[in-house]
Amino acid sequence: SIIRDQIGFEIIGSKDEKNDDQEIINTSLKSLKDLKYSSGTLTIGNVEIFNILISKLDIPKRWKLRLSRHFWREEYFTDLLKRLETNSDVDPTIVEIDKRRYLKMLKENKSSVIAGRSIEEILKRFDKKIRDPRRLSKGRNVSKIIREFLNIKCPINKAANVLNKFFKKYQINLVVDQRYFPTSSNRISKLNVIFSTSFGRQLEYYTGMVFKIDIKSNNKTKNVINGGRYDQLISDLGSKKQVSAVGAALNLNY
């Protein structure tokens, strides 16, 4: 369950994204000073990098929206990747019918209007639909790229290097600077600091940096702090303007 007894702290109206992300993590680290533990891990992820990657992949727009929207639903997301690999969402009968209609309309007067739309406009829509079905190899390749991306896990000071090698390998026009991350220290006090591309899938409102702190006490690993950036949550809750925000919560019943 994500419902817990918590104490939260946040920066509403965040103006300096990177500094404010660092401030939230630093405040989280300070809150550990009175806790007794032998070791722990600060895990950092970033939902924004995933969404940018998806936007650059060679798949139909509807698939980009689908994958970004359901990133946080891990089981369903895995099912989507399987469908992407097999083209199981594409009905060959419907595709063939669309092609026939398209070829028939090519012979008609382009200025004619059907149901409020010109033949020319309808042809453009048909052309897009016909081109949408993917070659099987393309779907498999895109799924492979996404799966490999989500397996990236490394010390935080190697995050930019590992990501950039990955982007270069698959000829993705994207470069990440190490300064993009809130810290480059692999160890802070008793905590190992790692970067994980698959972390951040627990709550759908995160939009950028996400993190958690787990500590080891009495041979048990316990989650004590979770947080991240949620730049759209306040507008989703009714605000007329977008208000950037970043925050975290300390679990009281860990």
What are these regions (language model features)?
Residues 58-90, 215-217:
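Acidic, His- and aromatic-enriched active-site or binding-groove loops in soluble protein domains
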Residues 17-19, 39-41, 72-75:
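Short C-terminal domain-edge/linker segments immediately following a structured domain
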Residues 1-37, 89-254:
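Positively charged, Gly/Ser-enriched RNA/tRNA-binding surfaces
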Residues 27-35, 48-58:
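Hydrophobic mid-domain F-helix/FG-region of cytochrome P450s
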Residues 24, 28, 46-49, 67, ...:
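Internal, well-ordered alpha-helical segments in soluble enzyme and binding-protein domains
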Residues 41-44, 194:
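Short glycine-rich phosphate-binding loop at a beta-alpha junction
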